[in-house]
Structure formats: structure tokens, C-alpha cells
């Protein structure tokens, strides 16, 4: 009788989907933890609203290319003050939407008193430039699954 409503092949397919989903979720949290400030995001959604956070992420996504372009221009011009100012803006904006890795990179860039800062700052700028899109994708994925 059950077979009439739920065939064995349907059952196997459903089990495979559940297993695949659980395997995916086992891999994803490490990405989430490295890239996102999960506690902050959960509190933000609880206090304000998920839609407000999504709107903030969209605003960040639209503004960061300009911040990065200015940061790169300041690197070329060897304008440490300008570089630090742009990195500070990125740090604040990234932190406000829970993008922990970008926030920490920007914090390093904005802190010329760090040991070997001059030797590392270009690498940090390059990493920020390379990773921001991916980090926003991870955040968007997290928000969709929250």
C-alpha cells in the first residue's frame, strides 16, 4: 500500500538529496566562520530585520569597488594617509554587514604600525580585491539559508 504513494526510487532519490545537503552543510560552516561574523549577523537579524541586512549588503556591494579603486590609487601614489582612510571605510562597512574576513584585512591595511606593514600591505590590498566578491556570495548564501 505504501508503495502506491511512495515508490522505492523516489525514496532513494530523497535520501540521496538529504545526504548531499548534510555533506554540503558540513563543509560550509568552516567557510562561514572564516568569512562571516555569524554571531553579529544573527543578532542583527533578530534586532532589526533580515531584509534590512540584505539591503545593507547590496549597498556595500555597490560601494566597495569605488573604495578599492581609491585604495589602489593611494597605493600607487604612495599616499599612506589616503590608503588608511579608505581601508578604515571598508573596515567599517564590512563590519556592519558581518563580513569578518574583509573587515580584518581592512584593519590590517589601515594599521601602518603593524610589524612589516610596508612589506605586506600590497598583499593585503590584493587579497581584499580578490576575495570581496566571494565573501559577499558566502554571505548571500548564508542569508538565504538562515
Residue ranges and their predicted role:
Residues 1-85, 89-146:
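Two-component system phosphorelay core
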Amino acid at each position: 500500500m505504501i508503495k502506491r504513494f511512495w515508490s522505492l526510487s523516489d525514496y532513494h532519490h530523497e535520501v540521496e538529496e538529504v545526504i548531499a545537503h548534510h555533506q554540503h552543510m558540513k563543509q560550509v560552516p568552516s567557510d562561514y566562520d572564516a568569512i562571516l561574523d555569524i554571531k553579529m549577523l544573527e543578532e542583527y537579524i533578530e534586532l532589526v530585520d533580515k531584509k534590512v541586512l540584505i539591503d545593507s549588503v547590496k549597498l556595500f556591494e555597490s560601494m566597495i569597488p569605488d573604495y578599492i579603486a581609491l585604495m589602489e590609487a593611494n597605493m600607487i601614489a604612495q599616499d599612506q594617509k589616503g590608503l588608511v582612510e579608505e581601508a578604515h571605510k571598508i573596515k567599517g562597512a564590512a563590519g556592519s554587514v558581518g563580513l569578518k574576513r574583509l573587515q580584518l584585512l581592512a584593519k590590517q591595511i589601515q594599521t601602518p604600525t603593524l610589524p612589516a606593514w610596508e612589506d605586506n600591505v600590497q598583499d593585503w590590498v590584493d587579497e581584499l580585491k580578490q576575495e570581496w566578491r566571494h565573501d559577499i556570495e558566502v554571505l548571500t548564501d548564508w542569508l538565504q539559508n538562515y
